[in-house]
Amino acid sequence: MKKTGAVLVAAGLSSRMKDFKPMLPFGGSTVSRHMVSMLKDMDIDPIVVVTGYRAEQLESHLSHMSVRFVRNERYRETEMFDSICLGVEAIASDCERIMILPIDIPALMPETIRQTLMIDAPILRTMCKGEPGHPIIIQTDVFPVIWQNDGHRGLRGAMEESGIPITNLEVEDEGIYKD
């Protein structure tokens, strides 16, 4: 199996909720600690958490978990795509492929992560009932082509416009898109 790292995006303002989603309780822990632990249990390494809003609080909260941090200092005026770019840049030289997912989808099932790790494809996207979600896994040698896109349609648009085949993995896990 190819060495897989992960980018956990946590830079957003949590504007749809009043609370800071990465710090919300989940399963005896918090959303962010649960997500990091789940990835570590699958031997995904390195893991970089892209912070922005309330960066110091989240970085302190996860400091004991052996993850890297990258800050999107412009989180108020940039999109998730920009945070993904920062995270990928931080770990691309340390792995062969990168799993990308937001930090706030704790209902994602470990079995879904296991399934994605078994598939070797330039770009792998999870789907549930025909709807795309996370995680997405992209081989590191594909990123230069994806970065040629300006990100105006996010990572999904950049992947679709790259011309690189996308392998869709249908899973029975609505956690791939439930935040």
Positions of predicted regions on the chain:
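N-terminal glycine-rich phosphate-binding loop and ensuing alpha1 helix
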Residues: 2-51
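Conserved alpha/beta core of the MobA/IspD/sugar-nucleotide pyrophosphorylase nucleotidyltransferase superfamily
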Residues: 1-2, 148-179
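Conserved N-terminal catalytic core of the sugar/cofactor nucleotidyltransferase
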Residues: 33-97, 111
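Hydrophobic residues at beta-strand termini and immediately following loops
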Residues: 26, 70-72, 126, 169
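Conserved beta-loop-beta/alpha segment of the NTase-like Rossmann-fold superfamily
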Residues: 76-144
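Short beta-strand segments
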Residues: 9-11, 101-102, 126-127, 170-172
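Conserved beta-strand segments of alpha/beta enzyme cores
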Residues: 22, 68, 122, 165-167
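Hydrophobic packing residues within well-ordered alpha-helices of enzyme cores
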Residues: 17, 58-62, 116, 146
